[in-house]
């Protein structure tokens, strides 16, 4: 799937999960929570993500419950 097909949504890290996954609350009207993992560049550059951080998550149009964290906003 092309990167342009992905849906980008902002959210907040709620809690870390096992194996590098995180629960993220999205900034949408009904505030659904998704399970997301760190994208390649965040992992490669050892970017730390802690609960309360604002992030951008990429979601596939085929599965809106799982995603990839592609950006962490600075405080």
From Swiss-Prot:
Record's keyword annotation contains Protein biosynthesis: yes
Protein name: Translation initiation factor IF-1 1
S1-like domain mapped to chain residues: 1-74
Gene3D superfamilies (alphabetical): Nucleic acid-binding proteins
UniProt keywords, alphabetically: Cytoplasm, Initiation factor, Protein biosynthesis, RNA-binding, rRNA-binding
PROSITE patterns, alphabetized: S1_IF1_TYPE (PS50832)
Entry function: One of the essential components for the initiation of protein synthesis. Stabilizes the binding of IF-2 and IF-3 on the 30S subunit to which N-formylmethionyl-tRNA(fMet) subsequently binds. Helps modulate mRNA selection, yielding the 30S pre-initiation complex (PIC). Upon addition of the 50S ribosomal subunit IF-1, IF-2 and IF-3 are released leaving the mature 70S translation initiation complex.
Annotated Gene Ontology cellular component terms: cytosol
Pfam family, one: eIF-1a
InterPro entries: NA-bd_OB-fold (IPR012340), RNA-binding_domain_S1_IF1 (IPR006196), TIF_IF1 (IPR004368)
CDD domains: S1_IF1
Quaternary structure (record): Component of the 30S ribosomal translation pre-initiation complex which assembles on the 30S ribosome in the order IF-2 and IF-3, IF-1 and N-formylmethionyl-tRNA(fMet); mRNA recruitment can occur at any time during PIC assembly.
Gene field: infA1
Family stated for the protein in its record: Belongs to the IF-1 family.
Classification via HAMAP family: IF_1 (MF_00075)
GO MF, any single term: translation initiation factor activity
């Amino acid at each position: 799937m092309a990167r342009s097909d992905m849906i980008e949504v902002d959210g907040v890290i709620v809690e870390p999960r096992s194996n590098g996954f995180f629960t993220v609350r999205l900034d949408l009207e009904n505030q659904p929570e998704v399970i997301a993992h760190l994208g390649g560049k965040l992992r490669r550059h050892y970017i730390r993500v802690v609960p309360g951080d604002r992030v951008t998550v990429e979601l596939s149009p085929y599965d809106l419950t799982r995603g990839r964290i592609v950006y962490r906003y600075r405080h």
